[in-house]
């Protein structure tokens, strides 16, 4: 029965499918919001109205894309579908908790949408800094609803993290050590640890903000001995690990895709890849104040956060060059998934380079809160995380659905998206260097040219989304079933065919370790 199968599911494949569908839908909402932003900025002058409504849209765009698109698709979708298959487990460790993790997300999304429907909306930016987020500048229920939304999404992620950690550590076959699990499994494990350690700090920060707003506490109010900078420290102690949470599963996906389409049986430097991810995860927790170079930190504090941030480039470089080494000498198949993966490697590296620029505290004084920062993080998210999701999606679509995508449409989709995102975000580096600030709905007309180019690019990206929807419809309409799969010991998830049966590995799997 439909209700029993889809509402009360305890099956990792069905829950993974729910996550993917929810993430895709949220992604379209987030895309619509981004199109509104770029429409407003396409030329000087007002389109939507004042800066409050503009900032409500910007804030909602960020929250929707981060908490309801990237995280549900990468961790909930790919994680649920693939982790049990890759380690030979019958399901997740806590199947009912898995269902609850998913069903906390729609109510959370509803609360976020409600926050923009009441009063003037939450126009705080995704950082929700007080005093702007306090009850003077944002009277009414909007910010409170946003905080409750974040609480639900956070609980969902924490439960999911506990589930993945338990599954990966406890549900491997006895003969399989942790260092024999695929890189995607490692990436999800490390991501889960980051979630478990960082989200409670966010919960504390936004709960203190909630009591400041409603119960007359003064955690972030100097009038009562509080300090708004405390909120920034709490938020960014979560916020920086969060950006690694968004990209780490992508690293895992790219490792699998690059290995598969290079005709290699294993990625180059497996151990180096694992340690690099662990290093990135650890370092992600000790660099948070690089988001705060303009708030008046001591010079020695700034020196530390600058150098610590630059250190992250080393394990990241290990990963990039290992992917290139995996490609080297391989029998490369130019499939759509491989194109997404190669696009990821190139554009993620560009985003990483601008990150190195921003890690310099002296330069960041000039670039902070300009479009240079926007360009930087959209290169690593809109062309890192999203390209990784697309690579994983077109690679594993036959596994999830049993049908194959049309190769030509998939390549066309990649080409349109590649042009669109680059045309959107590359000019923003110029705007930032010229001093255009973020989070404003209008600008001096000296900035018109590049904003117009950027907005045109965003409509090309929108076209790519429409092509993708058609491409998926075409696959299900044509029903081209998978005939054969090139299966090897390093891509265990394909073992049961496409799609795999509802229950896999019902008996403990026998793994012979070479």
From Swiss-Prot:
Name of the featured protein: Cytochrome c oxidase subunit 1
Listed pathway(s): Energy metabolism; oxidative phosphorylation
Keyword Oxidoreductase: no
Annotated residues for binding of Mg(2+): 368-369
Residues that coordinate or bind heme a3: 376
UniProt subunit comment: Component of the cytochrome c oxidase (complex IV, CIV), a multisubunit enzyme composed of 14 subunits. The complex is composed of a catalytic core of 3 subunits MT-CO1, MT-CO2 and MT-CO3, encoded in the mitochondrial DNA, and 11 supernumerary subunits COX4I, COX5A, COX5B, COX6A, COX6B, COX6C, COX7A, COX7B, COX7C, COX8 and NDUFA4, which are encoded in the nuclear genome.
Coiled coil (UniProt feature): none
Enzyme class: translocase
Location(s) in or outside the cell: Mitochondrion inner membrane
Catalysed reactions listed for this entry: 4 Fe(II)-[cytochrome c] + O2 + 8 H(+)(in) = 4 Fe(III)-[cytochrome c] + 2 H2O + 4 H(+)(out)
Organism of this sequence: Rattus norvegicus
Residue numbers on the Mitochondrial intermembrane membrane side: 41-50, 118-140, 213-227, 287-298, 358-370, 434-446
Stretches assigned to the Mitochondrial matrix side: 1-11, 87-94, 171-182, 262-269, 328-335, 401-406, 479-514
Residues annotated for Cu cation binding in this entry: 240, 290-291
Pfam families the record matches: COX1
Function text: Component of the cytochrome c oxidase, the last enzyme in the mitochondrial electron transport chain which drives oxidative phosphorylation. The respiratory chain contains 3 multisubunit complexes succinate dehydrogenase (complex II, CII), ubiquinol-cytochrome c oxidoreductase (cytochrome b-c1 complex, complex III, CIII) and cytochrome c oxidase (complex IV, CIV), that cooperate to transfer electrons derived from NADH and succinate to molecular oxygen, creating an electrochemical gradient over the inner membrane that drives transmembrane transport and the ATP synthase.
Cofactor note: Binds 2 heme A groups non-covalently per subunit.
Residues that hold O2 according to the record: 244
Binding annotation for Fe(II)-heme a: 61, 378
Highest taxon above the source species: Eukaryota
InterPro entries named in the record: Cyt_c_oxase-like_su1_dom, Cyt_c_oxase-like_su1_sf, Cyt_C_Oxase_1, Cyt_c_Oxase_su1_BS, Cyt_c_oxase_su1_dom
């Amino acid at each position: 029965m439909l209700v029993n199968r889809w509402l009360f599911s305890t099956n990792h494949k069905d829950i993974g499918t729910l996550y993917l569908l929810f993430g895709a839908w949220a992604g379209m909402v987030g895309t619509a919001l981004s199109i509104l932003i770029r429409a407003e900025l396409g030329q000087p002058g007002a389109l939507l109205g004042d800066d409050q409504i503009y900032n409500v849209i910007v804030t909602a765009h960020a929250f929707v894309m981060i908490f309801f698109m990237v995280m549900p698709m990468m961790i909930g979708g790919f994680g649920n579908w693939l982790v049990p298959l890759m380690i030979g487990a019958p399901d997740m460790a806590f199947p009912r908790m898995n269902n609850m993790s998913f069903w906390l997300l729609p109510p959370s999304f509803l609360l976020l949408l409600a926050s923009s429907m009441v009063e003037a909306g939450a126009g705080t930016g995704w950082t929700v800094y007080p005093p702007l987020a306090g009850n003077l500048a944002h009277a009414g229920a909007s910010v409170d609803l946003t905080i409750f939304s974040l609480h639900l999404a956070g609980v969902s992620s924490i439960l999911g993290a506990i589930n993945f950690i338990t599954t990966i550590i406890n549900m491997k076959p006895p003969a399989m050590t942790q260092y024999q699990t695929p890189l995607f499994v490692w990436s999800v494990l490390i991501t889960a640890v980051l979630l478990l350690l960082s989200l409670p700090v966010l919960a504390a920060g936004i709960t203190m903000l909630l009591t400041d707003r409603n119960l007359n506490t003064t955690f972030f109010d100097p009038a009562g001995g509080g300090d708004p900078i405390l909120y920034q420290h709490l938020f960014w102690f979560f916020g920086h690990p969060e950006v690694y949470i968004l990209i780490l599963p992508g690293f895992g996906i790219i490792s699998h895709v690059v290995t598969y389409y290079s005709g290699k049986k294993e990625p180059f430097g497996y151990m180096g890849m694992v340690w690099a991810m662990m290093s990135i995860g650890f370092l992600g927790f000790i660099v948070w104040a690089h988001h705060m170079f303009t708030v008046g930190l001591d010079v020695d504090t700034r020196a530390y956060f600058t150098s610590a941030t630059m250190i992250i480039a080393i394990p990241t470089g290990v990963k990039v060059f290992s992917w290139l080494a995996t490609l080297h000498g391989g029998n490369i198949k130019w499939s759509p998934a491989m194109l997404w993966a190669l696009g990821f490697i190139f554009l993620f590296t560009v985003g990483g380079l601008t990150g190195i620029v921003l890690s310099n505290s002296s330069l960041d004084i000039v670039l902070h809160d300009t479009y240079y920062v926007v360009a930087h993080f959209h290169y690593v998210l809109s062309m890192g995380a999203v390209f990784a999701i697309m690579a994983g999606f077109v690679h594993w679509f036959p596994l999830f659905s049993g049908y194959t995508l049309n190769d030509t449409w998939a390549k066309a989709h990649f080409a349109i998206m590649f042009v669109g995102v680059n045309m959107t975000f590359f000019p923003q580096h110029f705007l930032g260097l010229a001093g255009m600030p973020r989070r404003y709905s209008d600008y001096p007309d000296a900035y018109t040219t590049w904003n117009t180019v950027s907005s045109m690019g965003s409509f090309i990206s929108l076209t790519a989304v429409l092509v993708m929807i058609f491409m998926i419809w075409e696959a299900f309409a044509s029903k081209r079933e998978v005939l054969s799969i090139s299966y090897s010991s390093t891509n265990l998830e394909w073992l049961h065919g496409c799609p795999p049966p509802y229950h896999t590995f019902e008996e403990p799997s026998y793994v012979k370790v070479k």
